[in-house]
């Protein structure tokens, strides 16, 4: 969106109210865009906002912001069900716990929510203890390293993804991962 705002029925629509209600408890930060309904909070400085960055600048920006948790809300619709779980994988690579919408896009994410209240409960659960938080961060990083990063042991998995259609019996490496979950 040209003005860095997203429309009224955005992916945050079902969590906007709990974000507004928890401004006293959490520091909310948006990168790239923010929901129109939260504009007064952005303008007053109650919600921190950072404009879009070039793709290669994004990891450094995220590092400097040092987020505690990332969230990935999505409306449950055909378009979003067809998306990849890139936000989950990205957060795992950074070692940042991520709480994702409970739709098929994020079926591999261990922390998911359906409602805004569930999102807040999940944030509290992830951040309530330093040792639990570190364990979650480490587990996410291990997911990234063992399943997604371009390591030698993953090259065959990537080749299968490009050569064979979804659920094909020829996808031996990928299918074995799904069976072991």
Q: At which residue positions do the language-model features occur?
A:
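Non-catalytic membrane-proximal stalk/linker segments that position and tether the catalytic domains
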Residues: 168-181
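Nucleotide-sugar-dependent
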Residues: 6-10, 56, 60-90, 100-110
């Amino acid at each position: 969106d040209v003005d860095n705002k997203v429309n009224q029925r955005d992916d945050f629509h079902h969590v906007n109210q709990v974000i507004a209600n928890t401004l006293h408890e959490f520091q909310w930060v948006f990168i790239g865009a923010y929901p129109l309904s939260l504009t007064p909070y952005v303008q007053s400085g109650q919600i921190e906002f950072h404009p879009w960055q070039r793709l290669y600048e994004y990891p450094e920006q995220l590092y400097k912001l040092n987020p505690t948790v990332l969230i990935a809300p999505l409306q449950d619709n055909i378009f979003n069900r067809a998306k990849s779980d890139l936000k989950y994988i990205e957060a795992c690579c950074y070692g940042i716990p991520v709480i994702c919408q409970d739709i098929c896009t994020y079926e591999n994410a261990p922390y998911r929510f359906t409602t805004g209240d569930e999102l807040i409960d999940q944030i509290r659960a992830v951040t309530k203890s330093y040792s639990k938080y570190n364990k979650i961060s480490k587990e996410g990083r291990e997911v990234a390293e063992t399943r997604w990063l371009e390591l030698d042991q993953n090259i065959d998995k990537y080749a299968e993804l490009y050569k064979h259609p979804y659920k094909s019996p020829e996808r031996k490496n990928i299918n074995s991962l799904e069976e072991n979950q």
